[in-house]
């Protein structure tokens, strides 16, 4: 309540949103990158509820004003804020994990970012493909979700350089492009992406 009151009475939320829109030059991709960066910083060291309230009042309005669906905008900033738990320099989850595995916290944080890199891409696809959030018919949602699983698993294989065996550089590039295409909203891109991934697997 205090946070919302301060943001509302001072006009901070409107100013912050206007700042993001003006800096981005009304370019949605740039606005998304700036919003994610802001959400990562604002979410550092905060519990889930507090982080969401803060980013929902400061950063989400900028995306909504640029035509992004309300649910997608809020999920984008919420998801981004939660990723701050593994993002250096704060990375509270990494500090907890470091105490368990007895490793330097920053090393654990960097490895966490490497393993969880796909998670930093997912919020963008919430905006590009709102059906990932269940905004559509059951058939559409199931189909899009299945495609998302294929895309995320493929990206994870690319980042690790391993699928059913060690991947070559060319295989990683082809699978990576295919995985990104699968996550796109256009059906043609999805089909091209699946074809690219299958081509690599068949040629294995």
What residue spans do the PLM features occupy?
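Alpha-helical transmembrane segments of multi-pass membrane transport proteins
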Residues: 1-204
């Amino acid at each position: 309540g205090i946070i919302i009151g301060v943001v509302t009475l001072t006009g901070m939320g409107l100013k912050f949103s206007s700042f993001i829109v003006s800096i981005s030059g009304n370019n949605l991709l740039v606005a998304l990158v700036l919003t994610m960066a802001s959400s990562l910083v604002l979410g550092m060291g905060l519990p889930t509820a507090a982080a969401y309230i803060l980013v929902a009042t400061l950063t989400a309005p900028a995306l909504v004003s640029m035509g992004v669906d309300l649910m997608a905008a809020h999920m984008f900033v919420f998801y981004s804020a939660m990723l701050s738990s593994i993002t250096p320099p704060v990375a509270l989850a990494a500090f907890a994990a470091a105490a368990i595995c007895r490793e330097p916290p920053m090393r654990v944080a960097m490895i966490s970012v490497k393993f969880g890199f796909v998670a930093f891409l997912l919020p963008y696809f919430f905006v590009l493909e709102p059906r990932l959030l269940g905004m559509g018919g059951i058939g559409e949602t199931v189909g899009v979700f299945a495609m998302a699983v294929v895309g995320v698993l493929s990206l994870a294989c690319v980042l690790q350089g391993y699928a059913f065996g060690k991947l070559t550089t060319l295989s990683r590039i082809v699978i990576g492009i295919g995985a990104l295409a699968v996550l796109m909203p256009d059906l043609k891109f999805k089909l091209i992406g699946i074809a690219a991934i299958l081509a690599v697997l068949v040629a294995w």
